[in-house]
């Protein structure tokens, strides 16, 4: 989809859209919401007040995409799912960082809006759009409110968010219904497990334990061990150094496997105290670790996108090693233990 498609989709969802509302969408897609966060405490309090006042609903989508990178989070739907205001504010604040090339993006999206209006895709004529655009540009690029007619008909109540946070919604819903918990994120290589864990850490003020720190040492990589599904993770050390601390919210430390030296590092990884503990990485749902996780998440990806990401991230040589050796081992583990099927949440 390009921006014209997002405009068209918004026009279909909200027939009261006027040229002013399209311009607001262009500005939001280009610059985000940084201008709304000059006073974080005031912005937080305003969100809490607005959530208290907005009607609870399950009839509208939680997210509405407005560009390739940005979406609107509907407050009524957020409230309807019982999600905390503080989590939404953190998502909003994390999404409001300075957008690069904002003016360049604005000019590009303006051209796409011209084309969408000329094609008759929007709820106003091309002439109306051109007239509004001309008047708007006289005072330079700036944020605008929704039009009066849009506010009256649509009663917009939302916050902007980066679309990367949309993927977390099912996990956050599960977490909200559970309370402080141990979350384990398993899944396919390059599916976004690390990114997801990092985002959850920021939203939940959580701590992260990485399964990459528990690669199997060379001396344990016997033919017999590697024939075992999921045998290439050092689950014995994880069980000894990590499991006793999970679910307690306490600070602790563990040793990490140093891939550059192919041995366990004597320096320890410090895990800060937190009621939300996130175990991230392949084999984090291994049955040898027991049923330690309160919420099991499986992160999925299709094979083509997976290899495209691995090529960009790791280069051709490592991509071939992953494709021919490590990914088949992962897939055998997923299949043998029905890892995806046993997860509480699949994203």
What would you call each of these model-derived segments?
Residues 178-183:
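Pre-Walker A (Motif I) flank of P-loop NTPase domains
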Residues 193:
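Conserved lysine of the Walker
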């Amino acid at each position: 989809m390009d921006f014209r498609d997002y405009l068209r989709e918004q026009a279909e969802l909200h027939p009261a859209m006027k040229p002013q509302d399209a311009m607001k969408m262009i500005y939001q897609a280009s610059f985000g919401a940084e201008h709304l966060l000059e006073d974080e405490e005031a912005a937080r309090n305003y969100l809490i007040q607005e959530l208290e006042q907005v009607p609870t609903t399950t009839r509208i989508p939680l997210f509405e995409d407005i560009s390739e990178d940005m979406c609107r989070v509907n407050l009524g739907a957020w409230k309807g799912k019982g999600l905390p205001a503080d989590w939404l504010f953190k998502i909003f604040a994390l999404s409001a960082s300075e957008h690069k090339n904002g003016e360049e993006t604005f000019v590009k999206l303006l051209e796409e809006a011209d084309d969408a209006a000329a094609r008759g895709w929007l709820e106003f004529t091309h002439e109306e759009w051109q007239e509004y655009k001309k008047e708007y540009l006289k005072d330079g690029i700036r944020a605008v409110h929704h039009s009066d007619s849009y506010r009256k008909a649509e009663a917009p109540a939302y916050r902007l968010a980066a679309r990367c946070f949309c993927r977390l919604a099912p996990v956050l819903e599960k977490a909200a219904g559970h309370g402080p918990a141990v979350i384990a994120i398993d899944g396919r290589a390059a599916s976004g497990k690390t990114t997801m864990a990092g985002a959850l850490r920021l939203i939940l003020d959580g701590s992260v334990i990485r399964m990459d720190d528990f690669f199997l040492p060379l001396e344990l990589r016997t033919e017999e061990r590697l024939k075992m599904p999921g045998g290439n993770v050092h689950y014995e050390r994880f069980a000894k150094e990590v499991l006793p601390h999970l679910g307690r919210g306490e600070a602790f430390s563990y040793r990490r496997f140093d891939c550059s030296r192919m041995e366990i590092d004597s320096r320890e990884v410090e895990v800060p105290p937190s009621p939300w503990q996130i175990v991230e990485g392949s084999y984090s749902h291994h049955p040898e670790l027991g049923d330690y996780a309160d919420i099991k998440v499986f992160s999925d990806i299709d094979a083509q996108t997976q290899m495209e990401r691995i090529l960009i991230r790791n280069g051709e040589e490592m991509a071939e090693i992953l494709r021919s050796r490590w990914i088949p081992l992962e897939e055998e583990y997923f299949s043998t233990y029905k890892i995806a099927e046993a997860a509480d949440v699949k994203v």
